[in-house]
Amino acid sequence: MIYKFRKVNPITWKNDHVVLIDQTCLPEEYKTVEISSYEEMAVAIKTMIVRGAPAIGVSVAYGMYLGARETVTNDRNEFLKQLEEIAVIFRRTRPTAVNLFWAIERILKVANKTNGTVKEIQEAVLETAKKIHQEDLETCKNIGDRAVEILPTKPEKLNILTHCNAGALATAGYGTALGVIRSAWRDGRLGKVYADETRPRLQGAKLTTWECVQENIPVTLISDNMAAHCMKQGLIHAVVVGADRIAANGDTANKIGTYSLAIVSQAHNIPLYVAAPLSTIDFKISDGSEIPIEERDTKEIYQVGETRICPKQVEFYNPAFDVTPAELITGIMTEHGTVLPGELEQFRVKQLV
């Protein structure tokens, strides 16, 4: 495999359609797909051509515009009804990622508040989607820049372990957890990245390592069950992960395996941080028990590539996410700074969310 170094732009609005990096093809092939309808966007989200909570939020915003553009009525009320029907389809694609719901509600709010013709509402929806896209890029850079300040001061160059892919591919182009790592690398604070392979879809192996290679960031790939051993050997100084949904009390849903990582981090006195934009906090739910956990195709468990790895008689269970209790999280890194999980309420009070 020969890599060409490139800036990672997972989502691009181009004239009248969206261009996505097909993340199911990485790292073997760099391929883009053009999305011209809301149905195509729904499939892209469901099949993980695009994935990662912030990236899903940006993508669904554009998807809502594509759906708005496809409506065939000039009646405002009928248009809004059809737009809500499109929203229902998108809500069913990835139930755990709260950014998806956040972006949909923001689009619907703009559509309902915009006076004028259907065409003017469509234009307002597109401008909002573009704004969500740009805001996410700026937000992730702010998360990274602010978070570097609270990373452990010793050693001077840190080895940071991350899980799954919370990088440019999972956002508008900078990353949450990997955005923190990018900022640490820029500031000379990073020794190397340790990337969990992240079974069953291997986003750490396929996507996080690929991103690091694009920017010449030193990265070592380990299997998920090596994390505790690496910590005991003194190879890991901090853990930074992303999030798909954070409850009001700080309980955090992230890629399956994060909970285990949090337990072994605490056992070895290694800080574990969650890096996420405020849009990932769901104040409608009090704790992690209320977070819906997506279950995916069992083929992800029993098949690697085209090869089946176990007998056909075996049963399978494939939750895509787990919930890490707030007490196992050292801090939540946001665009407004890092706070303890129990301090999230201040953001709602300040109406930042």
From Swiss-Prot:
Its EC number is 5.3.1.23. Pathway: Amino-acid biosynthesis; L-methionine biosynthesis via salvage pathway; L-methionine from S-methyl-5-thio-alpha-D-ribose 1-phosphate: step 1/6. One of its GO terms (molecular function) is S-methyl-5-thioribose-1-phosphate isomerase activity. It is an enzyme of class 5 (isomerase). NCBIfam families: eIF-2B_rel, PRK05720.1, salvage_mtnA. It comes from Trichodesmium erythraeum (strain IMS101). Keywords: Amino-acid biosynthesis, Isomerase, Methionine biosynthesis. Catalyzes the interconversion of methylthioribose-1-phosphate (MTR-1-P) into methylthioribulose-1-phosphate (MTRu-1-P). Substrate binds at R51, G52, A53, R94, Q203, N254, K255. GO terms for biological process: L-methionine salvage from methylthioadenosine. This is Methylthioribose-1-phosphate isomerase. Belongs to the eIF-2B alpha/beta/delta subunits family. MtnA subfamily. The record marks C164 as: Transition state stabilizer. The keyword Protease does not apply. Coiled coil: none annotated.
